[in-house]
């Protein structure tokens, strides 16, 4: 499982600055679900070799009562989800009563907590940090989040202990799925090699994550799938967050369901309260090959559904959408829901949408057709010759635009990765291509390769001009000839 890091501290100590630096974005997934606070932010982070999830908790105010309230409502929940806590303080402002109260709480928890003194740029860092030792924390790091100073060393120290654990968990998952994790993925394939690799991948179990907001029917759908197949269920705990991996077989195809809601026994299917864990959901997305988002037709698509889809899209996962509780809706309501889905899901127009009833089983069987289609699309290997040929066909049908009097020239294309498919196109002035033409190329590849259910990423690389930045050095005879010509020009002017 991907490690989880929680940022805790009072307001204005730089938690959001560090969060934005780690996630490289200001557009985080905000938890706005029933039972969760509105100001906890979750983001994907990558620094060096480390991939992790970071949680930015809101600030904790200075009064003792406020600390108790805020910690109970928000920060303790984030700490409970986290593997390690970064307790941030302001090196310029110095030690405060709120810092002392937070430290007292952190000393009582049984999780690694590291003191991070921020804003030490331009000042004597050791002198500014000295008073914070009285908080009684075992470890202290000095950083300047705004400029990135010390952040890499901090993350290395925090996450290196989890590397061995992650390797062990990855080995367990590989044993379950019979999947090998090659050190370096092969990108260049002949057409024969591509076909052989495609067949190998189709023999591996598909890792399918069922995600969605609380009470949309995830547990009902999971039990419907398992009940229909009469599969013997066993649990393989991932971490303390207890995502459950459930091997199953359907239509001679093996799957591993990643269940974020927890498999309920039949007698407990009618539970109305379902605990929702953002971290568990994000980790399930990271682990999956295909993500199945369950939406409640009676509530329509929500901003939280869009956030989950956005996270899956950014992770490059294949996507299938199941609109649950479709039975019993009137014709007019169904038409309205379909229009809303068309309007709001334009950014994932490649995803198949199914209208189902998990309770009665209507439409559930067809979900797996789309899951297999999406997995095939994401894992199909395509040779350089095929990708280049499709690119030539696209440019013949619709030429690239002119840029400053010169037409953009696309030379060749090759694979840059799989799951999701990445296509690298080389050419001249390709950074000048407008977004509309990039979308045209992406859609052309999608149609030509019959790719459905997975995002496609196209990367452009400028072909280097070998003479750029070089001067043409003349030979001795050329220099003598140039002098004679210059002399002749001067004599004529006289």
Curated annotation (Swiss-Prot):
Keywords: GTP-binding, Nucleotide-binding, Repeat, Ribosome biogenesis
GO terms, molecular function: ATP hydrolysis activity; GTP binding; ribosome binding
Positions of the KH-like domain: 380-464
SMART domains in alphabetical order: AAA
CDD domains, per database record: EngA1, EngA2
GO annotation (BP), single: ribosome biogenesis
Domain spans labelled EngA-type G: 3-166, 206-379
Disulfide feature: none
Pfam families: KH_dom-like (PF14714), MMR_HSR1 (PF01926)
Residues where GTP 1 binds: 9-16, 56-60, 118-121
Record: residues binding GTP 2: 212-219, 259-263, 324-327
SUPFAM superfamilies named among the record's database cross-references: P-loop containing nucleoside triphosphate hydrolases
Domain of life according to the entry: Bacteria
Family, as annotated: Belongs to the TRAFAC class TrmE-Era-EngA-EngB-Septin-like GTPase superfamily. EngA (Der) GTPase family.
Physiological role: GTPase that plays an essential role in the late steps of ribosome biogenesis.
Assembly and oligomerization: Associates with the 50S ribosomal subunit.
Protein name, entry field: GTPase Der
Species of provenance: Vibrio cholerae serotype O1 (strain ATCC 39315 / El Tor Inaba N16961)
Lineage, highest ranks first: Bacteria, Pseudomonadati, Pseudomonadota, Gammaproteobacteria, Vibrionales
Gene of this entry: der
